[in-house]
Amino acid sequence: MHTQVAIIGAGPAGLFLSHLLYREGIACVVLEARSRAYVEDRVRAGVLEQGTVDLMHELGLDQRLRRECMIDEAIDIRFGNGKLIHVHFPELVAGRVVTIYGQQEVVKDLIAARIADGAPIQFEAEVTALEGLENDRPTIRYRKDGTEHTLTCDIVAGCDGFHGVCRPAIPDGVLTTYDHVFPFGWLGILSESPPIRETTYANHDRGFALCSRRSPKISRHYVQVAPDEDAANWSDDRFWNELHVRMNDGDRSEIVEGRIFQKGVTPVRAFVAAPMRYGRLFLAGDAAHIVPPTGAKGLNLAVADVRVLARALTQFFRGGSMERLDRYSDTCLRRVWKVVRYSWFMTSLLHRFPEHSVFERNIQLGELDYLLSSRAGRLTIAENYVGLPLEDE
């Protein structure tokens, strides 16, 4: 079997790319190692930048999103004894907002629409080899239902995540990787409880905390813990008690407790691989970069990658020009490093670092005090939070 673009991975990057290519009449096949149920049930972040929502609208895939989403017009940052930084997006960035809609819901919508279009997604198709990536007709070998299959293509899009097969298929010595692991993790829970009014971050002497929304009836909360912490050590009561303390909700009147139905520890790290291309293989999304969750950027950065890639592929298949493909990596990496910078800034601003001296702690609090009084400082947070403009228009 031959196709123009082989997309490895049916996460947000691969699925958005498949729809962008379908719109342009470019043939593609999506290969996903996991089952459809597994892919659709993975709970991930749910903060969508304006540009991501706009793309779903352009593709005609936003009907359920419009019915079920929530809109965040602001975030709050708490610190000290009751100090509050209110970052109101419409006031600071010309009416732009962020949308709360779970990544798993985005994935469900994208999969359903692709299947309705009659476009192929091969679930439980494990890629076993990528060959000829430096040639103009790469070969992909994959296993499905116990049978070996071969797919040839003109372009391979590596959208299979941090632990996928695409990035390791690039020969040694080609990639430079940048990796930074922070000295803490996030203990996160999902609970059946109405969420707090605004997405709220907290910098407390005992550590970072975050209260966020998933739906009108589901809350997503986090507290900073040691990177090797075991979630089993945290009873539900212990978690709620710690969250109330870090959010300065001493009278327990603001954060509503409910049944916790998911609990786990997430590492906090940044990772970038450069370049994001080798021959006819183009990396996108988590296959190329991981950002700390503090900035809520992972899905949105993946969408930005594939928008750039889709335009480059359209130019290539329509006119034979490699010009946009040749600058794909540089274009994407400029945005990637800006997003890593912002996520690093928010992470450094809001967490307690075990190695910090009293001097460094006071610098952190001084930065928060500056943001409290500076519109320019709040503007910097707002324009990054709602999403930077796409460069490769």
Tell me what each language-model feature is:
Residues 112, 119, 125-129, 134-264, ...:
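Conserved FAD-binding catalytic core of PHBH/FMO-like flavoproteins
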Residues 1-13:
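Beta1/beta-strand and adjacent pyrophosphate-binding region of the FAD-binding site
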Residues 296, 311-393:
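C-terminal helical "tail/cap" subdomain of flavin- and related membrane-associated enzymes
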Residues 10-23, 110, 158, 264-345:
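Conserved mid-domain beta->alpha element of the FAD-binding
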Residues 30-31, 158, 202, 284:
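Generic enzyme active-site microenvironment
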Residues 22-43:
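Glycine-rich FAD pyrophosphate-binding loop
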Residues 41-44, 49-117, 131:
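Active-site-adjacent segment of FAD-dependent monooxygenases/related oxidoreductases
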